[in-house]
Structure formats: structure tokens, C-alpha cells
Amino acid sequence: MSLTELILLAIGLSMDASAVSISNSLCIKKIKIKHILQMAVMFAVFQGIMPLIGYYAANSFENVIERFDHWIAFILLVIIGGKMIHESITADEEQDCSLFSLTFKLLLVQAVATSIDALAVGVSLSALNVDILYSITIIGIVTFICCTAAILLANRFGNLLGKRAGIVGGLILVGIGVKIFVQHMFFGG
């Protein structure tokens, strides 16, 4: 696999994590470096670790991943997105997204939900005899860059949305969950 192919793969894998980063950022009024690092590092680490797990689990784990990955991602993202929408609708006008809290637990769940596909990619990488450490390093770096860019862009527009930012962010998460589910159920992938 060439570097160009690997970067394109990494960009594809990072899209869900970037979209979730946008969703999170829409509910943070003043993004600090701490927020950027928390999100970008968490998503990058999981996008890198999951292919490694898939690579070494390869054949024995492939059927389990393919049968359940879309359900897990769908359920987690719909619950988190639904909670964000509910909190935004029921919040006072002054609160905007103030009920949103970027916790380690939330980021962990989001990182797992958005990196399940990367686990399956790891299975595929094992069949290609690629240098897995090099591959996961590229995937992690690209995910970090994409998430950082997404966070900065979303924060710029999030302040303009006010209370609706939480609703938009929640809808993004629900949309990603539905996309993953539909893609796996009806299009095999």
C-alpha cells in the first residue's frame, strides 16, 4: 500500500471522528487548546489502536466485527446525539449548550463508536501484509490533523448558532449513527 493510498484510507477513517469533533465543538463556547488536544488525541489514538487490534485478531474476529459493529456504533451515537438534542431543547435560552460536558467518559464512548470500522480495516490490512506500525502511525496523525481542523472550524460557527448548536451537534451524531447502520445493513459496508 502506497503512502498516498494510506493517507486516503486514513482520511476516510477520520471522517466520522471529525464529524463528532464538530458536534462536540458546537457546544463549547470557547475552545481551549485543552479541548482540542482532548478530542484530537482521543480520536487519533482509537483510530490507530483499533486497526492494530483488528490486524492481530484478523480471521478469528472478522465475523464478529462484521455482524455487530454497525449496531454498536448506531446505538452509541444515537443515544449520545439524542441526549444532546434533548438537553439543548429543554435548556433555558441563556444556557445554550451549557449542559454539555466534554468528559473523558463521553470522549471514550465517542472514540470507540467512531473507530469500530477501523477495527475491520485492521483485518483487511493483515491480508495486505502492510507494515502495521507505520500504517497506524499515519492513520493516527491524519485523524489528529482532521479532527483539529474540524474543531477549529466548528467553533468558529458554533458561537453563531447559540442554543441551536446543541441540536445541530446532536443531529450530526444521530446522522452518523444512521449512516453507519444503513451502510452496513443495506450496502454491505
From Swiss-Prot:
Membrane-crossing residues?
2-22, 36-56, 71-91, 106-126, 132-152, 167-187
How does it sit in the bilayer?
A: Multi-pass membrane protein
Gene of origin?
mntP
Localized where? Cell membrane
Q: Which InterPro entries match?
A: Mntp/YtaF (IPR003810), Put_MntP (IPR022929)
- What's the short name of a Pfam family annotated to this entry? Mntp
| Function summary | Probably functions as a manganese efflux pump.
HAMAP family linked to this entry: MntP_pump (MF_01521)
Which keywords describe this protein according to UniProt? Cell membrane, Ion transport, Manganese, Membrane, Transmembrane, Transmembrane helix, Transport
Q: Which GO terms describe its cellular component?
A: plasma membrane
Q: Which organism is it from?
A: Ruminiclostridium cellulolyticum (strain ATCC 35319 / DSM 5812 / JCM 6584 / H10) (Clostridium cellulolyticum)
Q: Which GO terms describe its molecular function?
A: manganese ion transmembrane transporter activity
- Name the domain of life this protein comes from: Bacteria
Which protein is depicted?
Putative manganese efflux pump MntP
- Keyword Transcription in the entry? The reply is no
Q: Which family does it belong to?
A: Belongs to the MntP (TC 9.B.29) family.
